[in-house]
A protein has these predicted regions:
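Beta-strand segments within the central parallel beta-sheet cores of soluble alpha/beta enzyme folds
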Residues: 17-26, 85-93, 128-135, 161-168
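Conserved small-residue
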Residues: 1, 8, 36, 72, ...
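Short acidic, glycine/serine/threonine-rich loops at helix termini
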Residues: 5-6, 30-36, 100-103, 144-146
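Active-site-proximal alpha-helical scaffold in enzymes
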Residues: 1-26, 63-84, 172
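Short glycine/threonine-rich loop-to-helix capping motif typified by GTGT followed
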Residues: 100-109, 138-155
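Condensing-enzyme catalytic core mediating Claisen C-C bond formation in acyl metabolism
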Residues: 47-125, 131-132
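Fold-level recognition of mixed alpha/beta catalytic cores in primary-metabolism enzymes, strongest
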Residues: 24-27, 35-40
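Conserved catalytic cysteine-centered active-site region
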Residues: 1-7, 16, 38-63, 149-172
Length: 172
């Protein structure tokens, strides 16, 4: 879903459209559930209460749920010319998602680093300009570790001073 927003952003940058509706939906199928269950990635499998607790010591996986979202993206000047209220502006985007592939930790860290680097470069920002990191943070120990390592690698010693949010734990 986020890749759909990134693709829409790039299409608007390339002047392929002025307005794009982008988003996504996730519907749980038994196959999807079984994949996550068999890999031990679901919260609550150890008898504890299901909870999404990204970066928490008590985390034990994610809560599988259905959801959807849609956003409307517009070329900025087009939106301003028509008097639209601007809620946010996408300044850069980076994604290195490869679904269905299981990579070693160092490869995963590198891919997350590249996504953050691409987003910063696309926005013309330096790491010192960042005031908040919105992590994927799905509550799985392995993925949280990968993201934490990538954040440390990109932002260095200053990473401990930048708040890290985890919206996925609240909205999926």
């Amino acid at each position: 879903s986020t890749d759909a927003v990134g693709d829409a952003y790039k299409m608007i940058q390339r002047d392929m459209a002025k307005i794009i509706v982008a988003g996504g939906v996730e519907q749980i199928s038994i196959d999807l559930y079984l994949i996550f269950y068999l890999r031990g990635l679901l919260s609550g499998l150890d008898g504890t209460k299901e909870a999404s607790l990204p970066f928490d010591r008590a985390r034990n996986g994610f809560v599988l749920a259905e959801g959807s979202y849609v956003v409307i993206l517009e070329e900025l000047q087009y939106a301003l010319d028509r008097g639209a209220h601007i809620y946010a502006e996408i300044k850069g985007f980076g994604s290195t998602f490869v679904g269905g592939k299981k990579h070693p930790e160092n490869v995963r860290v590198h891919r997350v680093e590249k996504a953050m680097h691409d987003a910063l470069a696309g926005a013309g920002l330096k790491k010192e300009d960042v005031g908040l990191i919105s992590a994927n943070a799905n509550g799985c120990k392995m993925q949280d570790k990968v993201e934490a390592k990538a954040i440390q690698s990109i932002f260095g010693t200053g990473s401990s001073q930048i708040p890290v949010s985890a919206i996925k734990s609240n909205v999926g």
